[in-house]
């Protein structure tokens, strides 16, 4: 059995203007219905970068809700979806690199596409390795689910933020992720073998100490 996760979920705890607790961002926090419908990619990127910064000064209070919404808008300005969202891992990775470059921040950004056709996919061990690498570096990862409906908590055509993965020898691989302010789970092995398992992964590993926001 192998279990890896980020060191502190509490660093991603935010309080909304209504006093509700949220873990990570909710894409409904964007301004305007278009952004709220298609903001999962930039919201996921914002969560990853926010966590990296929070780790540097964990004793400080979390970002105020109104400022986090501004942070999301800034992220949208660079990690901008197309009219079809951000349906490929390489697209999100490119936008993240652009954001980091504009902020003069050096990061190692990796992406992996997971095609629907089994013959075109990477081996599932490569998927585990990529997620484990992110967790080993104590950074959340971005996971894209396209048309797979086999996992009830995982929306289709949607980016989520992976914060942990727990594998056993029986083939179970529980992924812990954040989506719209909640902690959720899905079985990666089940996702891989059932339905249309197309999607992708993006990881972001920082290489210096510059703040993101």
Language-model regions, residue ranges each:
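Active-site-adjacent structural segments surrounding the nucleophilic cysteine of cysteine proteases
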Residues: 1-98, 102
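Short alpha-helical interface elements
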Residues: 64-65, 69, 73, 121, ...
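Predominantly the structural core of cysteine protease catalytic domains
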Residues: 82-167
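Active-site signature of cysteine proteases
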Residues: 4, 125-129, 134-136, 145-213
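A sequence-level detector of short, solvent-exposed, charge-rich linear segments
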Residues: 59, 63-64, 111, 115, ...
